[in-house]
Regions:
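…; additionally, a secondary subgroup of soluble metalloenzymes is captured
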Residues: 1-150, 157-205
Length: 205
């Protein structure tokens, strides 16, 4: 039972055994159907070992996500689906509006819901566009970088929502990461908006 003191210890042992057995697919489909009988506790009986279970976790979040407090959901995901937990970790922009916006955005994306208060915030920002003066322009940020012996890796269409995940993975790998978030000119498509490449003319990329 989820209320047993040794539940998570048994959970980890079972997860290891399943990995050693090769996560038998013959039983996985029926298990994922039956486990939904656990209701709001379903997620505690799933692992991230296989794509099927990961998809079942998202099906659970769609159905029961709003029934769990965010901090409780985060605690469970840290054990059940660490990568998803890392995705939901906050990235601190140093601005309350951006911090809250992206945390709410990621949470709603994961539970597959759009909450009314978030819609109101989006509509409000569509008019105010406060992010335009909260964040520095990309050109000025890049010009301030030390580009000597730099290597440039360009990742197109990677959302800022992944910064919390990236920093968490860097910590796991004992890597040092320094991130500067900026705003680009519209349209942001690469073919029309890549003036920054000129600043890295001598860099490797």
């Amino acid at each position: 039972s989820i209320d047993d003191n040794d539940f998570w210890e048994c959970y980890e042992s079972r997860k290891v055994v399943l990995q050693q057995m090769g996560n038998p697919s013959s039983e996985l489909t029926s298990y994922c159907k039956v486990v939904f009988s656990k209701g709001v506790n379903t997620i505690c009986y799933l692992t991230d070992n296989t794509q099927k279970e990961q998809e079942t976790i998202f099906a659970f979040l769609d159905k029961y996500g709003l029934k769990l407090a965010r901090n409780k959901l985060m605690d469970i995901l840290s054990k059940v689906y660490p990568a998803l937990y890392q995705y939901l970790l906050p990235y601190r922009f140093g601005n309350a509006l951006l911090d809250q916006y992206f945390q709410d955005y990621k949470y709603q994306k994961v539970i597959n819901k759009i909450l009314p208060e978030f819609v109101s915030q989006v509509e409000d920002q569509a008019e105010k566009r406060e992010y335009n003066y909260i964040l520095a322009p990309r050109t000025s940020v890049i010009e301030s970088l030390n580009r000597k012996d730099a290597q440039l890796y360009f990742m197109d269409a990677m959302g800022v929502e992944y910064l919390g995940y990236i920093l968490s993975v860097c910590r796991d790998l004992n890597l040092i990461a320094s991130i500067k978030v900026c705003v680009s000119e519209l349209p942001s498509i690469t073919s029309r908006n890549k003036e920054f490449l000129e600043l890295f003319a001598d860099a490797r990329y």
